[in-house]
Amino acid sequence: MQDHQFSYEVDAPVEDVWAVFWGRKTGDVIQLGKVRIEILHGGDDNGEGLIRHCHFPVPWYLLSGGKAKSWEWLTQVKKYESWRYDAVGKPLWSKATGWTRLDALDGGRTRVHFRETYHVFNPLMRFLLEKVVHNAISKDNDQKMKLGVERGLKARGRAATQPSHIRASGN
């Protein structure tokens, strides 16, 4: 099993950062470069039960045309605080679990913590490919998530004006 975690800070209060992640409705589509996220079910008022279908690039040697899909559902949603997702992905049949937590900081800033575990079902494929594929899939997640939050804040009229930092660990 692979485990990747990182955190970063943004110049916005928790409520504004939460709003970037939440408030999606059934049928919404989020496109960030080669990553496409379709909201299949928006969940309840807090996002509990949200279901999304994700399309993202993977290494060519998986023989899928460089494309992968995952089906994800969100649970354990605590408004303005944290949530969890579970996912099943292919072509390398796998399970991922992710946790996101928001911490309010002084000065109206927020620290975002993210952790994901990744597990390939087939024992042979797990031995041969799990680590290298997870590294390929998650190599830019830190920057992409931070950039997505900052763009979302800017679109909401709350630009991140101070430098933010990313700490990553895992694998």
Residue positions per predicted region:
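Hydrophobic ligand-binding cavity/cleft-lining segments
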Residues: M1-G47, G170-N171
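Ser/Thr- (and often Asn-) enriched beta-sheet segments in non-cytosolic proteins
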Residues: Q5-E9, R36-E38, H53-H55, R84, ...
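A short, structured loop/turn motif at beta-sheet edges
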Residues: D11-E15, D44-E48, T75-S82, R101-H113
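Glycine-rich portal/gate segments that line the openings of hydrophobic small-molecule binding cavities
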Residues: D28, E38-P91, Q143, L147-G170
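Beta-strand/loop substructures that line and gate deep hydrophobic ligand-binding cavities in soluble
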Residues: D86-Q143
